[in-house]
Amino acid sequence: MTSGHALQPERPERKGETALAVEQLRRSFGGVPAVDGVSFGISRGEIVGLIGPNGSGKSTTVNIVSGSLRCDSGRIQLGGSDITNRSAYEVARLGLTRTFQIPRVWGQLSVAENLLVAGTQLADESATRALFGRRALRRRQLDLESRLFDILETLNLSSLAKQAAEVLSGGQKRLLEFGRILMSGASVLVLDEPFAGVNPVMCRALQDIIESLRADGCAVLLIEHNLQAVEETCDRVIVMATGKIIAEGSLAVVRNSEEVRSAYMGTAS
């Protein structure tokens, strides 16, 4: 499996520029805080791990950030856009793509069709036609087709291009999810346990894809229980417990925090 770096739509190199900013996020259920004053930022070209024990508020946080859940208060900035409490569809159109613990694919569509749909996610065909005419729209379609073939080859999915996505193995569906990211050209990625249930070879392949996306200027928020993969992949980590951020820094540093040890009941050591 080759690197996906060359396959990405061109993005300006702006490493260090804030891509995602979360400020004082709060959400309660039945009066019980699930997310309580969470604030963090991620820069372009940075991979940040979000870890914590079960019930720490990680899932609620990423659901809010990706538009799947509304917050009670707080603010979320995606680049220069305020995406607070905007729908998942709107958030995706603005450049934030999310994967899930269990890979989600459009089962009735073929592998190639899944990728093509992702490629049109950030573009409005009617607007393209109105502004630039049919010739420009056709050029964009040809570009999508070219990227499609490159990505299928890179992910070793060429032989499955016409296969219905619903019959793929779990690992193949995970690859297809990442292929859709490559097609979409998203600038911020929220990856929810991408290494869960995959073998070491597949884990390494996914890490290579994530690294290529980072090299291309993507900002990545990685939610993961596999601490070895987190240490190998992330620039820094954020640790949550009881709805709050309790530590932030390198994994080597935060795992020695007494508060982190207490939250994990010793499992983080």
Where are these regions (language model features)?
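ABC-family P-loop ATPase nucleotide-binding domain
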Residues: 1-26, 269
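The feature captures the beta-strand-to-loop junction immediately N-terminal to the Walker
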Residues: 51-53
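Helix-to-loop junction immediately C-terminal to a conserved catalytic motif
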Residues: 66
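Conserved ABC ATPase "signature" region
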Residues: 127-160, 208-211
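Catalytic Walker B motif of ABC-type/P-loop ATPase nucleotide-binding domains
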Residues: 189-193
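A short, surface-exposed alpha-helical micro-motif characterized by mixed small hydrophobic
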Residues: 230-232
